[in-house]
Amino acid sequence: MKLEYYTSLNHNPHYNLALEKHLMESCPEATIRFYLWQNEHTVVIGNNQSAQSEVHLAKLKEDKGTLARRTSGGGAVYHDLGNLNFSFIGDDSVFDIPRQMQMIAQALCDRGYNAQVNGRNDIEVDGAKVSGNA
């Protein structure tokens, strides 16, 4: 198995989501790609969500925010430079969601945080959600 690491220094959500899609579509077999990025003032919605139902669009526009849609499902999430986004990308033969989530929780524990994975693939610290994963 090969591990590849990517970081985007671009804070444009459309660029970052397009790069994530490209990394997914071009990922070779037996490879895991780990991708890190940050977006400026953005609401990202899932592929099947209605922006009108999920986002206060007038307020987002007033605040000069950006609306973006990811290709995967999941709920609406707010991004800014205070949070770090990550993706594990790989085919089913190398990808193990519980294992990946446990690795992240363990890394947080190693840094002194009381982190654990809950039943929805979210990571919690002291019972508060710090990472949602799809």
Residues covered by each model-derived region:
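N-terminal lobe of the biotin/lipoate ligase/transferase fold
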Residues: 1-95
